[in-house]
Amino acid sequence: FYLNTAFKINDQNPLGSAAGYGSSFKLDRDFTTKELGFNELKYNVISSQMNRGKVEKSVAIAIGSLASTLSKFSADICFYMTQELNFISFPDEITTGSSIMPHKKNPDVFELIRGKCNIIQSLISEFNSISINLTSGYHRDLQLYKGKIIESIIDIKNCLEIFNYSINKINIRKNI
């Protein structure tokens, strides 16, 4: 849901809005919309400028929502693996032993996914801090979003791949 919404918000061609309130260059915005693969044109150039940073925030919210789900799922796995519950287990290849309790299997993979996903969820707060006192138009501060967004997309993709690999190795205790 959130990822689809973020995609729709971002699938509008802002080309021609320039750094502030439009451009004096003759530009066929319908043509560039089609050629750049956008679904539609962002008609109001002032709206494009007012939305600077907001489109990135929509992606951050979508990724954060996915990270929240993955973090909670990982936390549940860690909880269900506790000695008190012992509902599930995983093979040695994705767990580690404890230095003081060698028989114990630590769910490191899921603990690290949980931690990484919690960091990803903080992205929206970082974005809000960057843009809180900016006026309309372009500001160099906004370029700080790009690296953070790319890093978070890579991180959530890696978390999903590792989670998918690991969850397929789950052993569910029978007769609980």
Ranges and model annotations:
Residues F1-N133:
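Internal glycine-rich alpha/beta core junctions
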Residues M101-I176:
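Glycine-rich cofactor/substrate-binding loops
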